[in-house]
Design a protein with these regions (language model features):
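Active-site neighborhood of phospho(di)ester-bond hydrolases with catalytic His/Asp-centered motifs
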Residues: 1-2, 24-30, 48-53, 74-77, ...
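Binuclear metal-dependent phosphoesterase catalytic core
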Residues: 12-13, 69, 92-98, 114-148
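Conserved hydrophobic/aromatic beta-strand scaffold that supports enzyme active sites
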Residues: 22, 63-65, 112, 131-133
Length: 148
């Protein structure tokens, strides 16, 4: 999920729809306070979060990586890698880190693709009702673009 920009109810609706079946949630920035509030409402939610360019004064990291189900997931809001002008910088960073999956937001444009062996997803903007899901089944990565 990314870019809620104050659309808390849409964020909460997405979380409520998937709270029982999602292993974790990753919030990709530009709505830090919205997501922080969600962590209080849903204390059982496992999550990771990074700062976006509109999360002024944030102490969150600009990017992070996790290991999940034997896959490495690299994620950022995207602005440090200039994703509005192309994906080569963020994909290069994901490759450098040995990532299998690369997640970013910032552009508000939802899309999923596989490039240079890396599964790349921008879930779009929560404010506009877009989000993404990734399912790892028997080591295979499945990306799902979603809208509420």
């Amino acid at each position: 999920m990314s870019d809620s920009h104050g659309a808390q109810q849409k964020l909460f609706d997405i979380i409520e729809m998937h709270l029982d079946d999602a292993d974790l949630f990753i919030f990709l920035g530009d709505g830090e306070k919205d997501f922080e509030y969600a962590t209080y409402l849903y204390p059982e939610m496992k999550y990771y979060q990074v700062a976006g360019n509109c999360d002024f004064g944030s102490e969150l990291p600009a990017y992070d990586e996790i290991k999940f189900d034997s896959k490495t997931v690299f994620f950022s809001h995207g602005h440090p890698f200039y994703v509005k002008y192309g994906y080569s910088d963020i994909i290069s960073e994901a490759q450098r880190r040995g990532a299998d999956i690369c997640l970013f937001g910032h552009t508000h444009n939802q899309h999923s693709l596989k490039q240079d062996g890396i599964y790349v997803m921008n879930p779009g903007s929560v404010r506009e009702g877009f989000y993404g899901m990734i399912d790892i089944v028997n080591g295979h990565i499945i990306m799902i673009d979603c809208k509420i």
